Every structure is written in structure tokens, then in C-alpha cells.
UniProtKB/Swiss-Prot annotation:
Domain of life per record: Eukaryota
Binding site for substrate: 582, 584, 666, 693
Source organism phylogeny: Eukaryota, Fungi, Dikarya, Ascomycota, Taphrinomycotina
Species assigned in the record: Schizosaccharomyces pombe (strain 972 / ATCC 24843) (Fission yeast)
Recorded GO CC terms: cytoplasm; cytosol; nucleus
Domain PI-PLC Y-box per the UniProt entry, residue ranges: 638-753
Protein name as catalogued: 1-phosphatidylinositol 4,5-bisphosphate phosphodiesterase 1
Ligand binding (Ca(2+)): 343, 345, 347, 349, 354
Amino acid sequence: MNCEMVTSPESVNLGDSNRAVSPFCLPDCSENAVAQTRSKTLDNAALDLPYVGNRKKSEQDFFKMLSSRDRDAHSTLRKRSNSLSSFLSTKSTSASENKFHGGLNWLSLKLNLLLRLQGRMNSARTNTSMNPYSCDSNENLSTLSSVNQNFNSRQLLATIVPESIQNGCSLLRITKKKVRQRKVSLDPISGYLMLDKNTGKAYKKLCVDDIKEIRQGRDARNYREQYKISSENEKRWFTIIYCADNKLKAMHMISPTLDAHNQWIMALEGLKTYRLNEFIIGLNLVCHQGEKMIDYSENLNPWEKLEKEQSAQLDLGDVHRMCQMLHLNASMEFLEETFQKADADHSGKLSFEEFQHFVSLLKTRSEIVDIFKEYTSGSDKMSLEQFRHFLSTSQKARLDSDSIRTLYVSFCSNDDSKMGLIEFTSFLLSPHNSPVVPVIQDMSRPLNEYLISSSHNTYLLGKQFGGESSIEGYIRSLQRGCKCIEIDCWDGPNGPVVCHGHTFTSMIKFNDVIDAIRKYAFVVSPYPLFISLEIHCCPDQQRQMVSYMKQAFGDTLVMKPVTANESVLPSPEDLLNKILLKVKCSATPLHQFSTDILKVGITDSSTDTTESSELENSELTGLRKGKRRMKNIIVQELQQLAPYARSLKFRNFSLPESKTYSHIFSFSERTIKKHGKAMVPRLSKHNLRYLCRVYPGPLRVGSTNFNPQVYWRLGVQMVALNWQTYDTGLQINDALFIADPPTGYLLKPPCQRIIGTTVGEEGLPRKIKLTIDVISGQQLRRARELSNSETLSPYVEIQVHSMEESPFRWCSKVVHENGFRPFWGETMVYESIISDDFYSMIRFLVHHRGSNGNDSIFANFTCPIDRLQQGYRHIRLLDMQGENLLFSSLFLKIKKEDI
């Protein structure tokens, strides 16, 4: 059934006064009818909207599109997109991603896309194949859809996105001020969700590739309640979480019927999964068992018998348009040169066989061919002994003979049990050749001996002044492996709320935050989660917090010591899947007055636990002038929920309270800078035994980050950063905790956890030489801001962040108009004296040189120098939101030596 556009009423601004009268009001175009519309429920209005279509029939059609072996997996289609989004939100290079070799046989399989655009799809058929795509090296996600060869892409897309949704349906869009009907359509070809297209109005569009998650039902309840929408609409409400301008945003919709709602969810999730599948299909994949190469082009014939042989030929323009569709950022000059090599009969058009040759030419990487020839003495096969020689001399691998043999056999061809060029390339791209040394650490040490991935102002999505508070900040942080989050609690009209006090930020319910934490606390890592509570609530609302946390967290909340008579903190292993509260505690009477002056302006989170005695003296002056306020009273019921992170106001490192194993000090960066070098040795000594947290100062209104290396070198366990800002500081933080899967914990070096040692005692400062050959790039993704006529012109910048105040920088030349396979062949040499290579970082940035001379960074990768492996390595790139750029990599040769 087609979904016709319904004439929507004029939008009416729904202020707080309107919302207070009715949980939900559909606005009327008549000013005189406003009072009547306040009593009109959304359900009644929704009944007037047309039915989107027959979802059951669409599902049956979709089943027909699947091969028999995949029909069992169809039931997971609705969950698959969210699972993939969750996986892709983590920036760690997982083993599964490396199982996809960046070859180009998929071009052959997707010729039908171009033919469809040319109107020649009558006889062309496509046959796609299953791809393993797992969250880690051991477990696969639900298998991606396999499409039967009797159906083409047009049929599949029409099934995923019904015609009614393609043409546009009336949905209600909910914003802060308005509720209005919008014509919403989904274009399966471009992948854009569009609002009010072809209605004569300015329209908004959103690419499904930018969708991070789709929330519905109870998972979106907090948004529905925030906008005061009746619970009767819960089943038809869905929230699209997407990324735009490097920020998380939310789009809220209500479908007219439950069937329409379900069809929209399936269309959005199905198209997102399909597009990811399209990007993967046809690549030279590595099988999950044995990780052997499969060349699908030998097994598939998507062309079959065409009615007209001439329609099976492509000219240079066709190939260029196809490469643009498939994000192959190659210049016209490069494509023309390759095209001419493949055009054997010089006809100016490619047959299918010639196109296969064209693809093989694109796939050929001369730099790997040269390496292969060097270690095989020109042979077309690499023997076991030659492979062993390559690993030991080039890659500096320390593997025993049996391990090398097992690795070699797993990559050998089934035909002759020998490693050819394709298998060798597969190895270079596999997790077995990762550029980063895997983290294998003891998790049985006390908590104070670990660095803990920590977030500051977790609830904010943007700036500290006037920004938006959202549970998305908590969800995204937890999905990325954060293990210490912050909640600023304030009195709300109907219970505690979370916001950044006195800064005009929005508010969210405390209970909604707790619900989100409960759901996502351990989805990535089972190790304990710290919740830093900053309390600004009255005693009654504090008790409400206690009650709800006990109810929501249950046994996962640690409310008493794990064992009796403890003298040291428990280990992460002792606290698997446990939640620890960090709460300000005091031995002084609860009714005392504070010496805090009333501060005007931006609230510095945690200030009540960080000020030194020097600051206290200045505040006493304020008291004499009559500027005083009642200290926040932390009720005993709440203090008792923090057996291992009792936050104390810092007075002196020598006091008895500073030597209790369960206390924690919190300092702003401003406080540490103010005390300077005098504080450094005492703080470092304190952090050998006890917990400490450092967070950004209040003047960072843009939510920027400091360099966390400064505080890691002092042994600070919880260096809290603004995770909403993916700047250099956060990239360095992510690099330190990089792991697959992420744990959120990293054991400190011995000098920072063993009493009696000092920094550098494991080894004197040494001079190192780091040589990196920047060889080439692979399938660099086109930056969104580029115009359709502009081709990527990349260059590489390398930075070394060590103890120097300014990082070392080196830049390559610009490769103009080639983002598909740029070749640099340049060498960076870095020499320096290093005593703390545990915290020293190397950072790779890929820039685009614009036609107007403006440069922009579109990809990055950061890694600790001491964990950077030597030899030929592919580094997997991230975009500037910290998301994986699938199949985009830099090919390097790395050498480290002491001099």
C-alpha cells in the first residue's frame, strides 16, 4: 500500500506551559483551537495517518531473497545493525576487521549497480556471498545476509526499503519546541533519509551510514519523557542516534501505527546492514577457519547471458562513475592508464574478461610484489624457511618453530601447500601481523596499581556552557571501554537530575542515567566500573538516589568490603562485573558550615574535594565578609555505599586520613599546576599505594582536553578527560588503553607501583632511533566535506609525543588526486633520549590538501612507542570521531633501535 502524504497542520511552538497541561498535544493550525488540541491525544491523530504497508508480506519476500542456509539468521536482522554499530563505535582494530583483505573483486560483482543506472538490468544477475564479521577474534556477529543469485540488487533493495517508504510517509518529528508532521522518505540508492523532500520546503537529509544506533520502546523512554510525550506512544516512538559535525545527535520520530513503526525500523537497520555488506562483498576475504584467501571472482558469474552482448561492455566514463560510487578515490588519469592496460583490443570498452583484468591491475600492489620477490629470490612461492627468515629478520618476531609452521600452513594455498603472493599479502593484512603488541597483563594486583580509563562530565555531548546533557554520553563512553564515569547530581522538581550546574545545560533524570549504566556497564569489559558521584542534592533526594541505585544495580553494586580485615584494595579480578561508587566522605559532623565561598559562573565539578589548605585560607576571608553557604550534606546512607573510593578533601599527604587504603583524592589540573614541582614527588609517592583522580579545569568551556601523559607520569590512576571531544588528548588516552577487546585497565610500570623504586630505575634514559618508511595508503575514505568534483590528495603527518613540551613533527609529500592507492615511499627518522617510552606516543595523521590550499585531517592512528611492532605493518585508520575507517590503512616499515 502506498503511503500518501497527509496535509500536516501548521507547527505550533509547544512551550513548557503547553506541555505541562497535557503529556502530548498535536498542534492545530487554528489559533482559536489551541485549547482543544491540548486534549487531543497522539493516538487519535495518528489514526488519520495512512498505513505504511504490509510488513509481514515484506518479510516473506525477504525470506525468498535469502539462500536456504541463511534463513535461520534472518531473525537477527533487526538486531544486526545495532550490533555492527556497537562494534564499529569501538576504535580498537579487532581481529575480525583485519580478516577483510582490501582487494577489489567486489567491483566485478557490483557492475550491476552501474548497469542499473544505465537502465540495463533486465538480464544481469548478482550473486553475493557470506562474510564473517566478528566482534573479536573468537566470536562472529550474526551472519550478514546472503542473497540468492536469482535476485538482483534492485529487488533486494525494494524488499529492504518498501516503495511506500521510498516515496515518503508522514511521521511526527519531536524537537525541543515543536511537534509536527513531516514527510519522511528513505532512498535505498543514495542511503539518505530525507525530511520534506519534494514538498517545496527546505529539507533535511541524513545518511544511514552515520546512524550509530536506533532506540525504541523502553530504550528510548528517557527521550520520550524528556519531551513530555505520553507513554501510550512508546511502542511507536523511535530515536535515531547519529553523528554529524563530529557530534552525537538524536532525531525523534513517532510512526502512525505499530506496523509502520516496525517497517521503518527494519528498513533503516536493513539498509544500514546492506550498505555495509555492499562495501564488504566481493573483497578477497580471509576465511575464519585457517584465514585462507578466497577469490570470489573465480566462482561467480554475475553477468550470465545478456540479451545484448554490447550492454556488457563498459567505457572509461562508466568505470569512473562506478569507482566514485564505490568510494575509490582515484584520479581520472590513474584510471585511464589502468583502463588502457586492460583494454586488450583497444576498443575503448571493457568486456567482462577485460574488466576482470582491470580489477586485477587495481589490486596489484607493486610494493608488496617487491617485498615478496626479495624474500623468495624471484620465485612465485615462499617456502617455510623463507617465511621464517622474513619473520625473524624483517618483522623481528620471536616465535618458536612450531608456531611459525602453524602460521605458515594456515595461510598456504590448498593446492600445493605453499604460500604465494596472494597468501603473503593476506598475512600482511591479518591480525597476526598487527602493528601493536597485544596487551597481556596480570589483573590480580590491587586497583591502585592500574591506570583506569576515565571520563569527565560524561553526561555532556558538547560544551560545558549551554551544552546538551544526555544519556548518550554514558552509553558511548561505556561502549568504548571507559571504566570511570561521572554523574553530577542536582535537585530536580520530581527527583534528582543530572546536569552541569549553573551553566544552562539541559537536564536528564538521574534514574535514566542509572538505567543506561546498568545496561551498558559491562558490554565491552567485565572489569569493575567506577561511578564518581558529585552530589549537590538535598538529603531527601540523596536517599532517593540510594534507593534507586540499590534497586537498579542489585548485587553488582559493591556496598561493603569484599573480605574482612583488608589493608589493600581488591584487584580487578576480584571485582568482575561490579560497580564501585566514588562518594565524598567526611569524618566531621554533617551539620557543619562549609568554608566554601559562593562561586559565580561555571561549576568546577569536584571542587568540593580538591581545594588545598592554601585555597581554604582565601575562602576564610570570604566567610568574614559574610559570603558563606551550607556545605553539601552527604547522608550516611550514601557514604556507606563507597567502601573503596571514599573521596576526601585534600589537606595534606602526611595526615592519617591520607594513609587509609580506601580513600581517593581528586585534583583539578589547575590545582596541580598551582602547586607546581613541589607537589610532584609527594603526589607520585602517594599514588604508589592510593587512588587519585585528575580532571580538566573549569576554564575549558569548549570541553577540550589536556595532555594526559603529564598525569600518568605522576602515577595518577584516573586521568579523566572530556570524551565528547575527540582531540589529541583523547586520542592519546585511547591509544594507551588500546586492546582487543578493550579492558579499560592498564597495569602501571613497576616504578609506579613497587615501593622503593623511582622513575627510570628499570633502565637509565636511553637514546633511541625510530625509522619509519611511509610506503603507501590503501582505500583512503573520501572526506565528507569534499565536493563531488574533488579527488582526495593525501599526505601523512607523523608526530612523536614524549617528554618534550612540543611534539616532534614530520610530513610527507602530497600525492595529488589519489586516495585509492597513494604511494609515498618516504622515510621519517626520529632520534631522541627517552626514559618513559611506556607513555611516549607516536601519532599518524592523514591530511587532505584542498584545491584552495586548505588542509584538513580526515584520518588518524595513535600508538604507544614501546608497543609499536617492527617490520612491514598496516595501521588501520580511524576517522576524526574515533570510528574505524573500514579497509583504510597505511603501509609502513618500522625500525626501532638503541643508539
